């Protein structure tokens, strides 16, 4: 966007484009539409869907984007009553969401578990391949004039007395007038280079995949187990972000998201655990997640897992995005947080 507005942009990437969280996630998009009074979340979710439409439909990038909609499983009567009220409230505020019976859900997702009390359906949610999408954004930026430098691990950032910054990597030095920190889970160490404390914690997410299969799952899939638990206690404190699946090493809830990729792989994940910069997968957690997924899509219980992986997500301590100007530094901006 900056390059399209004729700004001179240099992007420094520690590894390769899409090599970490931007390329390791499930690839789910969007919320429940714009609503009657769009807020920041609306722009970040529904706005993202519009950007993907533009990139794929208008600009011709193959991002495997489609507006598939999301089905979120409701597992018991207490959850059903809670989300029945929630759906009414959201619809009154102009959001696109429906409460479906299991029979209605199976009419649009035949493999869904027909024994559950119901499902929430959000037609304005979509999906895309995260690696293809991130690389497409990088290519579009270069076509608009941005310069992308990969394998540039930043080791220091120095404010200049005349304004601007010097950024030192392991191999090069760069200077700029304005600096944007879009460093995800690495906000803490990068912030320390500038003498500022950024309240973002690395949270490990992990996923698993089956072999490629003919099309069996049409929507992105979720579950209300976690959101219902977080509605009662989000688990946050002064050092712990809200809405995690573990606290102090113990599981507090189960979280779920997944879809079937264009290549036929079925991928699911959900765990959110504060473990520092730990990329190792936990086989026990993977199995808990697979069992959770099979409660929603039963045939998954019969499929072997062929690969697993993990990535780090940037969770802010208050659960809100951190976007905008950093007030204690001139010409310093940040885009981070979940």
Could you describe each region identified by the protein language model?
Residues 1, 29, 33, 62-65, ...:
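Active-site substrate-recognition segment that forms the wall
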Residues 13, 101-102, 150-152, 169, ...:
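Short loop/edge segments at beta-strand edges and connector loops
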Residues 4-7, 99, 146, 161, ...:
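C-terminal lid/capping helical subdomain adjacent to the catalytic/cofactor pocket in oxidative enzymes
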């Amino acid at each position: 966007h900056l390059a399209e507005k004729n700004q001179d942009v240099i992007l420094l990437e520690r590894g390769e484009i899409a090599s970490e969280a931007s390329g390791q996630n499930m690839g789910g998009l969007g919320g429940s539409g714009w609503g009657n009074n769009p807020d920041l979340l609306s722009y970040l979710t529904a706005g993202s869907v519009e950007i993907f439409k533009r990139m794929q439909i208008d600009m011709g990038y193959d991002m495997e984007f489609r507006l598939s909609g999301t089905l979120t499983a409701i597992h018991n009567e207490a959850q059903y009553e809670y989300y029945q009220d929630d759906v009414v409230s959201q619809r009154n505020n102009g959001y696109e969401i429906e409460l479906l019976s299991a029979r209605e859900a199976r009419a649009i997702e035949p493999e869904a578990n027909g024994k559950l009390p119901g499902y929430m359906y959000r037609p304005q949610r979509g999906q895309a391949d995260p690696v293809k999408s991130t690389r497409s954004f990088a290519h579009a930026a270069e076509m608009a004039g941005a310069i992308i430098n990969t394998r540039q691990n930043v080791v220091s950032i120095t404010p200049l007395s005349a304004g601007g910054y010097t950024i030192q990597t392991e191999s090069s030095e760069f200077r700029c007038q304005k600096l944007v920190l879009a460093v995800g889970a690495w906000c803490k160490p990068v912030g320390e280079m500038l003498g500022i404390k950024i309240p973002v914690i690395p949270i490990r997410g992990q996923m698993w995949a089956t072999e490629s299969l003919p099309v069996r799952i049409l929507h992105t899939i979720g579950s209300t187990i976690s959101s219902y638990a977080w509605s009662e206690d989000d688990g946050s404190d002064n050092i712990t972000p809200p809405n995690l699946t573990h606290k102090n090493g113990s599981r507090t809830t189960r979280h779920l998201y997944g879809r079937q990729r264009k290549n036929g792989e079925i991928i699911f994940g959900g765990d959110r655990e504060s473990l520092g910069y730990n990329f190792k997968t936990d086989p026990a957690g993977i199995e808990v997640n697979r069992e959770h997924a099979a409660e929603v899509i039963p045939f998954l219980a019969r499929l072997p897992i062929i690969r697993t992986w993990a990535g780090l997500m940037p969770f802010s301590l208050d659960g809100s995005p951190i976007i905008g100007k950093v007030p204690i530094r001139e010409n310093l901006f940040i885009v981070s947080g979940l």
